[in-house]
């Protein structure tokens, strides 16, 4: 455990949950694995306060606990990964709101705040209840409640319910009670179908190492395993341990909620310019919509939408946020940003449809908890997606043929290399209604866009043939490695210039080189090359290896080889990133404490939202400066978190 990640996680826990949580977490980080008496001794906290704090931290998944079978003693240790995800909460909620709507983001925020929660408890929370509609002049018109992005409409709610007096109030209360399950449960099922929440298992409260040791102990106690010896025993135990570990950690809730590889109710992704064609956003709206908008929206749902499924989720299920699945979704968003550098909007839309299909079938970014060393990581292909399935998800209004590039009519040839016949009317070809091409041509155009994405330098896609059908997939590990290299190269170029970037690329491609050979390949003067190498060596990006020619080890008889180790550089950059994030949070805390009294005044209920009325000109200027400074520091932390995700999580 490094110093700076421990410092960063302690700051995050203390800022989000208070000093008690921060003190317990810091004690566990300092002494690592402790029993309750030892933790009480080192933390110097009262027993009752410590027990309540530990119980709440276990609820938030900030602390692992494991009870030894031999001793019967419970050990506690910090969960750094869960503590770090506190910094990514805003990004996750923004993604959920964009994907599934505002109400889904509210539900996810509530689950994230509670750590984990039963469905029956979520039903009782007032913030998850639908807001009561307003009545005008005694007449009440019940607005239609709809979860855009999930195809869930408030069935059982009268569209036009005009009520008056006491009977009207009772009817309104009954309608609200009926609306609740049609709003919360479909949203939970939508989150579960996408994999963003999963069932809490007992193994989730134990560390990965404890789960592995427990599985190995259980397997080795079996009678058939005791009869094995040697290499066969090791291989069998390793295989069965991995299988048992997957079963214990599996909290998948997608069973019965996925149809043909797509979550039920998933909405077709709009193509470029789709937002301008529709005034409705992917969020929960509590306003009435006219019939034209309703018909337009209904045409965009998949055929197997969840709107007809009124079965609520089981009340006894305990759910939590599935951060591994969310990492997959955020990684796909980074791949889209990488593709946007060289591709058109239509190609990006096709690539997004492919990644969306792959996301539904991918549970985590990688199988191993740590990223293997450079060159030791094998290829890992995603589940292949058929070309026809991708074409079904593409927005029909997207011009696929024209976005690749028009051909000269005199030089136009078809797929067989022959000139097409002029079968149009007056020289004009009519593809279909609204200018749309036929299904066969559209599938071919989608394949052309995917083939364009498979070209160097990034090779974002790869074609496969499954059951004699063309399919496309993504090689995630090589793309994740490419993202890491691009991030390192961007940093090297920003610090040392393009000459240093050229030297690093040569060393990465050729391996260890002496100064003379490096100068010949990079075509740089010796003076410039030595200055760049010295500055990068001081920064830890390149290093020098001495290879003596004889046992005397004389400098004149020694070969000096320069090399670039991306793994060591990545680890060093990761530590520097943790340190920078920690310093940003410390600076933010210092600035907040310095303006504590003023900020308490601005956060009062009567002042908040009415700053111009209650604050002076000097105070308004100070508030504006504070908000700008806070946005700057938090924005820097979010940018650094993107770097951590690329270097560590993807």
From Swiss-Prot:
What are the annotated GO cellular component locations?
Answer: RNA polymerase III complex
Q: Where does the UniProt entry say this protein principally localizes?
A: nucleus
- Biased composition (Acidic residues) is annotated at 149-158, 288-307
**Segments of this protein annotated with the region Disordered:** 133-163, 264-283, 288-313, 400-440
UniProt entry tagged with the keyword Zinc: yes
Tell me the domain of life: Eukaryota
- GO molecular function annotation: single-stranded DNA binding
**A GO BP entry:** DNA-templated transcription
> Where does it live in the cell?
Nucleus
Residue ranges for the region (Leucine-zipper) are 577-598
Q: Which UniProt keywords apply?
A: DNA-directed RNA polymerase, Nucleus, Transcription, Zinc
Show the PANTHER family listed in the entry. DNA-DIRECTED RNA POLYMERASE III SUBUNIT RPC3 (PTHR12949:SF0), RNA POLYMERASE III DNA DIRECTED -RELATED (PTHR12949)
Q: Which family does it belong to?
A: Belongs to the RNA polymerase beta chain family.
Cite the record's note on assembly.
Component of the RNA polymerase III (Pol III) complex consisting of 17 subunits.
**The protein's role, per its UniProt record:** DNA-dependent RNA polymerase catalyzes the transcription of DNA into RNA using the four ribonucleoside triphosphates as substrates. Specific core component of RNA polymerase III which synthesizes small RNAs, such as 5S rRNA and tRNAs.
What name has this protein been given in UniProt?
Answer: DNA-directed RNA polymerase III subunit rpc3
Which organism was this protein described from? Aspergillus terreus (strain NIH 2624 / FGSC A1156)
């Amino acid at each position: 455990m490094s110093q700076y990640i421990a410092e960063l996680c302690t700051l995050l826990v203390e800022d989000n949950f208070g000093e008690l949580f921060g003190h317990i977490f810091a004690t566990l980080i300092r002494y690592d694995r402790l029993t309750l008496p030892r933790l009480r001794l080192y933390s110097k906290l009262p027993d009752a306060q410590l027990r309540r704090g530990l119980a709440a931290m276990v609820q938030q998944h900030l602390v692992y606990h494991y009870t030894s079978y031999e001793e019967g003693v419970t050990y506690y240790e910090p969960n750094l990964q869960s503590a770090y995800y506190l910094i990514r909460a805003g990004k996750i909620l923004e993604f959920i709101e964009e994907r599934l709507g505002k109400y889904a983001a509210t539900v996810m925020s509530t689950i994230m705040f509670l750590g984990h929660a039963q469905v029956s408890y979520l039903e009782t929370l007032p913030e998850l209840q639908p807001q009561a509609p307003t009545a005008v002049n005694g007449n009440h018109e019940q607005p239609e409640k709809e979860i855009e992005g999930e195809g869930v409409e408030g069935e059982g709610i009268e569209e036009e319910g005009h009520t008056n007096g006491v009977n009207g109030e009772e009817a309104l209360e009954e309608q609200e009670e009926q609306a609740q399950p049609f709003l919360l449960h479909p949203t939970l099922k939508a989150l579960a179908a996408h994999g963003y929440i999963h069932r809490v298992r007992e193994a989730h409260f134990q560390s990965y190492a404890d789960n592995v040791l427990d599985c190995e102990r259980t397997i080795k106690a079996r009678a058939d395993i005791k009869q094995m010896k040697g290499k066969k025993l090791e291989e069998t135990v390793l295989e069965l341990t991995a299988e048992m570990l997957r079963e214990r950690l599996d909290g998948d809730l997608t069973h019965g909620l996925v149809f043909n590889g797509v979550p039920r109710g998933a909405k077709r992704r709009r193509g470029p310019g789709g937002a301008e064609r529709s005034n409705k956003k992917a969020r929960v709206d509590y306003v009435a919509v006219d019939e034209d908008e309703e018909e337009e929206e209904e045409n965009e749902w998949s055929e197997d939408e969840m709107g007809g499924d009124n079965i609520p989720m089981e009340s006894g299920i305990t759910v939590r946020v599935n951060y591994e699945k969310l990492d997959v979704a955020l990684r796909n968003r980074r791949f889209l940003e990488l593709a946007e550098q060289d591709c058109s909007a239509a190609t990006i839309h096709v690539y997004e449809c492919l990644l969306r299909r792959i996301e539904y079938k991918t549970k985590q970014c990688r199988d191993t908890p740590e990223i293997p060393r450079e060159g030791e990581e094998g290829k890992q292909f995603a589940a292949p997606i058929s070309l026809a399935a991708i074409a079904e998800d593409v927005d029909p209004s997207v011009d696929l043929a024209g976005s690749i590039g028009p051909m000269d009519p005199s030089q136009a040839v078809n797929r067989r290399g022959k000139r097409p016949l002029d079968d149009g009317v007056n020289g004009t070809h009519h593809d279909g209604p609204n200018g749309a091409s036929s299904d066969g041509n559209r599938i071919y155009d989608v394949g052309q866009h995917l083939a364009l994405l498979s070209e160097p330098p990034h090779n974002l896609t790869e074609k496969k043939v499954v059951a004699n059908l063309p399919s496309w997939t993504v090689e995630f590990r090589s793309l994740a490695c490419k993202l890491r290299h691009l991030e390192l190269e961007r940093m090297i170029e920003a610090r040392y210039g393009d000459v240093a970037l050229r030297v690093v690329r040569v060393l990465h491609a050729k391996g260890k080189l002496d100064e003379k050979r490096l100068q010949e390949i990079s075509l740089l003067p010796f003076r410039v090359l030595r200055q760049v190498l010295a500055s990068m060596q001081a920064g830890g990006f390149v290093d020098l290896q001495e290879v003596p020619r004889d046992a005397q080890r004389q400098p004149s008889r020694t070969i000096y080889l320069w090399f670039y180790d991306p793994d060591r550089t990545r680890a060093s950059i990761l530590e520097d990133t943790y340190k920078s994030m920690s310093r940003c949070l410390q600076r933010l805390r210092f600035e907040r404490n310095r303006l504590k009294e003023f900020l308490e005044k601005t956060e009062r209920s009567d002042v908040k939202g009415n700053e111009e009325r209650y604050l002076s000109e000097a105070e308004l200027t100070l508030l504006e400066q504070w908000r700008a400074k806070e946005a700057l520091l938090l924005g820097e932390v979010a940018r650094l978190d993107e770097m951590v995700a690329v270097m560590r999580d993807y």
